[in-house]
Amino acid sequence: MSHYRAKTALPLCALPFIFFSLSVAAAEAQVKIDTQVGFHGLFRLGYPFPLRVELANLGGVAQGILEVRVWKGGPARGVDLYPVYHRRRVLLPAQSRKSFQFTIDPDSVSRPLTLTFSGAGSRWSKEIDLRRHFSAAPLLVLVTENNFLPPLPVGPTFAGPLISLALGDLPADPRAYQGVSALVFYEQSLRDLSRRQLAALEGWLSSGGRMLILGSLHYALYQEAAMSRFLPVRVAGLKRFSALPDLDRRYGKAGAPLKDLWGQAARLVEGRAVLEDGGLPILVETDRGKGKVFYLAVDVGRPPLSRWEGLPALFRDLLASLPERSPTPQARWDDTVFSQLLATPSFISAYVPVRSFFLWTLFYLGGAGAVVWGWREHRLSRRKLALCFVLLNALASLGGYLYFSRRGNVPDGVLLTATLLDGSTGGYAEAQSNVALFSTQTRAYGVLVENGWSDLEALYPRPGTAAESAVVAEEEGSATRFSFPLSEWGYRLLRIRSQSLFPLGLELEDRGDRLTLRLNNRSAKDLTECWFVVRGQSFFLGDIARGSSLVREFAREAKAPASESQRPRLDLREIRFDNRLHEVLFRHSFFPDGQGLGRWSGDGALFFGWVREASPRVWTDDGHVLAYDYTLFRVIIPLDGGGDLDEG
C-alpha cells in the first residue's frame, strides 16, 4: 500500500517543477547589454581594438542577432561614410549570461558605436561614446599572475598608459593588438591560452609587435611549451650572479653596482645575446617577422634589481618604439584602375560568353541573310518578308534575353583578386590584396576573407544610401564573411592587408665588379615568369620550382652615374608575360604608371615572380560567381652604387 501511495504522489510532486519550467519558458526575454571597450576601457586612437559584449538574459529563452554598427570612411579616408555591421547569431538560455568578442576599427570617434540585440519581435540597443575611451599614445600591456604589478619604471620612459591584464582577457584576434606598443610577460603561465589566442600573439609579432619577457625566480613557468614558443632561449634553472659588470657598465649610474642577484640559467636558441655573463645570456633580442622579442634573465620584481638606479635606462631601450620602416610602393585600386581592367578583352571574356554570343550573332546574320535573299529573288511577298523580319527580330531578341540572362553560362558576378606579397626577413611576407566584385545582376553578394587579416577597407564607387553602401561582417570558423548588395553592372572594391609565411631565401652579394644573386625557394609554391631588375636593367630568370635554388651573376660594365638624374630608369611596362591577364594586372594593378610606380630607378634591386596556384585569401562559396585569383611575389633590396650590368 505504501508503494502505491508513493507511486501516486510522485507525479503530484513533479507538478510544481513542470509549472515553473513552463512559466520560465513562457516569460518574455529581458536582455541587458554590458560592454568593455578596449583594454580595461582604453584603446589607441586610429587602430583596431577589442570590444567585449556581455548579454544578460533575465527572462525566458532568447534567440536573435547581436549587431555592432561601426562607421567607416569619411573625409580623412577620401571616401563617403558607410556603415559596417558586425553580426553574431546568439541563443541565450533562460536566466543566463554570455560574452562575445569583437574587433572593431572605426575611422572616427565622433560617431557612437551602436549595439543591438534583436529577436522574436523584441529589440534592445545601446550606444557607446568612444570619446571617453581613446588614448593618443600607444598602450603598454602587462600580463602577470594574479595581476601582480612589479615595479616597472615606465613613467618618464614611456608616454602611453600601462595596463595590467589578466591572461583570459587577451584577445584572440591579432588585429586587436595593433594599438599596443609592447606586451610584457612576468611570472605568467601561458598553458591556459587557447589556440586562437596563441595564434593571435604570433600573428601580431610577425606584423611588427614587440614582446618583452621578464625572467623571475619561478623558472618552471618559463619551461612550459606555450611560453617556449616565444622565448629565444631554453631555461634550465636558476643561477646566482655575484655581479653583472656589463649590465652595470651599459645602464648603471654612479651608485652602488649590482651584486648577489638571482637570475635564470638559460641556453641561447635563436637571436643574439646583447648581454651575457660567463656564457649565459642575460639580455636576448630576436626577430619574429617584422616584430621583436626581448628576454631578460634577471628578476626585476625583486631586490636588488627592483631598486637599481639603472633600471629606467634599461626599460627605455627595451620599450622604445620600433623604427619606422619606409613604406614599400604599393598600388591601390580605384575607379580609374578598375575601369581599365574592366575594359580589357581578357577580363571581358570572364563574364561574357564569347562563343555563345558569336553563335547567336551567326544565327541572326544567317536569318537576316535568308530574308534579304528571299526579297532579292522575289520568292516572298512583301507582307511575308515583313512578317519574317519581325519574327526573326522577336525570336532573336527574346531567345537572346532568356539565354544570356538566365542560362548561357553567364555568371551573376565575377570576383577578381590581385595579391602582392612583399617579402621580408624571417620568411614572412606582407600581403596586400586588391579585390573587385563585379555584378551582372541586382542581388546581395558575399565574400570570405581568411582570418589573420590586419586591415580591410571597402570602397563604394559612387555615393549611395546607407543600405546600398552597408557591409555586414560575420565570423564563420576560420574566415570572415563580408556581405553587401550590388546593382546590375555595379561593382565594389576591397583592400585587404594580411601577413603570411612565404620562405624564399634571397641573397645579393656585391663583389665590386659583379653582383651575385642567390635564390632558394623554400616555400610550398612554384614561382613562374620571374624577373630581376637592377640599375635600370631587367633580366628574365624563368621558373623557380618549390625546393629549388638559382644562382646568377651579373657583371658591372660602367661606373656609377655622377648625379641622380643620370641614373637609368626602367619602364616596367615593357616587361612581357605569357599570360595576357598577368600583363594587364602588372601594368594597371601592381605597378601602375598613373600612381608613379611604372618606372624603376637604380635605388635598389627588384625581384618578382608569379605564384602558381596560390592559396586564395579571398574567395566565394557562391556557385553563380566566377572567381579569379592572381598573386605576385616581390622583394625590394636596397642597393648603393651604380653601373650597368651584364649577365654572366
Where is each model-derived feature located?
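Alpha-helical transmembrane signal-anchor/signal-peptide segments
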Residues: 386, 404-425
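A glycine-rich, often tryptophan-bearing local segment used as a flexible ligand/cofactor-contacting loop or short
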Residues: 154-157, 175, 185-278, 314
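Short acidic, flexible loop segments centered on an aromatic residue
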Residues: 61-78, 529-538
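A glycine-centered loop/beta-turn motif at secondary-structure junctions
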Residues: 179-180, 210-211, 264-370
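Intrinsically disordered, low-complexity Pro/Gly/Ser/Thr-rich segments with frequent PxxP/GP/PP motifs
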Residues: 72-108, 537-564
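Accessory, solvent-exposed terminal regions and/or long lumenal/extracellular loops of proteins
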Residues: 341-350, 437-648
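Internal/C-terminal transmembrane anchor helices
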Residues: 382-406
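Aromatic-Pro/Gly-enriched surface loop or interdomain linker
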Residues: 47-50, 108-189, 216-217, 233, ...
